[in-house]
Structures are given as structure tokens and as C-alpha cells.
From Swiss-Prot:
Key word ATP-binding present: no
Protein residues bound to orotate: T145, R173
Enzyme Commission identifier(s): 2.4.2.10
Pathway entry: Pyrimidine metabolism; UMP biosynthesis via de novo pathway; UMP from orotate: step 1/2
Record keywords, A-Z: Glycosyltransferase, Magnesium, Pyrimidine biosynthesis, Transferase
Gene Ontology molecular function, alphabetical: magnesium ion binding; orotate phosphoribosyltransferase activity
Record's protein name: Orotate phosphoribosyltransferase
Requisite cofactors: Mg(2+)
Catalytic activity: orotidine 5'-phosphate + diphosphate = orotate + 5-phospho-alpha-D-ribose 1-diphosphate
CDD domains, sorted: PRTases_typeI
Functional description taken from the UniProt entry: Catalyzes the transfer of a ribosyl phosphate group from 5-phosphoribose 1-diphosphate to orotate, leading to the formation of orotidine monophosphate (OMP).
Family assignment from sequence similarity: Belongs to the purine/pyrimidine phosphoribosyltransferase family. PyrE subfamily.
Length: 206
């Protein structure tokens, strides 16, 4: 399905007050319609794959961003002081959660973790508000395969003095990421597994 302003206007506009379970069902459909593709692909890890999930097709979609913000906010521990993620995939996710948190009177700032330090100015790896040392940060990700991408964000945040003990992803490809996080003492949660997407993809007749 190709996104257009016309298709958005004709679609079922999701009310901002919809309950999280409803948003979760609608987000799954959106991921199947816009992000999930079958074919021959090579992942960022170098692994070949018979399918690909282009998360930005949904994380940058207006209704998708709203659903993501509300769903992930509901999964955050009550003592979360910030959300963060590795650029570029996590940028719209942490932003959506932060914006929604302000509307729900639970303001949580967002941090963006660079893959390489800036070559000018502060030369920082981490962009966003300065937090106190020991602040609890949850790392967010769009798709987890091996778990290595989000781990880079975890390492940068810990090096800056923050406490990180949890990673939350929109989709778990179930290719070792969850086991990896467990092995390094990180809690891991995913909104959907790849089985959820593939089953719904078939139900939608794609």
C-alpha cells in the first residue's frame, strides 16, 4: 500500500482518546500494510532475509506515531526519567513517546544517540536535555534482530552516567535479540513478534 494524503483522508481516523488495546490492533494492521515486505533482503547485520520491516513507514506516519507514543508510554516503568534510542530508526519513536507523555501529564524527555560523535561543537554522542547522573533511561527500538543496535545506545548512555536496564521494541524478529539482552542483564519487551506480523499479514490477504 502506498501512503498518500488522500488515503489518509479516506481512512479510519483514530481518535486520540482510543484505548491502548484498540491502538495496538490498528498499529499491527498499519505495520502489515506499510512496513512489512516479503522478498530477498540483506539486513544491517549482514544476514539474508526473506522479509524486511521498514519501520519508518509507520513511525513517521501521523496515526502510527500517535499509536506508538501511547502504546510505548503505557509500557514504561513509572520511574522512567527519559527515553532514548540510536539514530535514525529510533528518532521518531522517542519523539512520539515524549510528545504523548506531555499530553498525559507525565512529561518524559527524549534523547537521541548518535552512531558517531559530532565533529564540531560539543562533539557529543547524546542529543537532548541534560539529565542528572543516575537518571533512569529506557532504550526504544523499532525492530530488534540480534540486539546489537540498541546495545550501542545502552553503552553510550551508561558511559554518560545514566542507568539503563530495559529495552522496548516495536517488533522482535525473534533472531536472538531477546536472548542476547537476557545474557547481559537487560529486561526486554516487544509490542509485536514477527509471528504476529506474519499471521496478520496473511489474514489481510497480502
Amino acid at each position: 500500500m502506498t501512503y498518500s494524503t488522500e488515503s489518509l483522508a479516506q481512512s479510519d481516523i483514530w481518535p486520540a482518546t482510543a484505548d491502548v488495546s484498540t491502538l495496538r490492533r490498528k498499529l499491527l494492521d498499519l505495520l502489515c500494510q506499510l512496513a512489512y515486505k516479503e522478498g530477498d533482503f540483506v539486513l544491517s547485520s549482514g544476514q539474508p532475509s526473506s522479509y524486511y520491516i521498514n519501520g519508518k513507514q509507520v513511525t513517521l506516519h501521523p496515526q502510527g506515531a500517535l499509536a506508538i507514543g501511547r502504546i510505548l508510554l503505557s509500557l514504561l516503568p513509572s520511574d522512567t526519567q527519559a527515553v532514548a534510542g540510536l539514530t535514525l530508526g529510533a528518532d521518531p519513536i522517542v519523539t512520539a513517546v515524549s510528545v504523548v507523555s506531555a499530553y498525559e501529564n507525565r512529561p518524559i524527555p527524549a534523547l537521541i544517540i548518535r552512531k558517531e560523535a559530532k565533529g564540531h561543537g560539543t562533539k557529543a554522542y547524546i542529543e537532548g536535555p541534560n539529565l542528572p547522573e543516575g537518571a533512569k533511561v529506557v532504550v526504544l527500538e523499532d525492530v530488534v534482530t540480534t540486539g546489537q543496535s540498541a546495545m550501542k545506545a545502552v553503552d553510550r548512555l551508561r558511559a554518560a552516567g545514566y542507568v539503563v536496564d530495559e529495552v522496548i521494541s516495536l517488533v522482535d524478529r525473534q533472531q536472538g535479540g531477546a536472548e542476547f539482552y537476557q545474557s547481559v542483564g537487560l529486561k526486554f519487551e516487544a509490542v509485536f513478534t514477527i509471528m504476529d506480523l506474519q499471521q496478520r499479514y496473511q489474514e489481510l490477504g497480502n
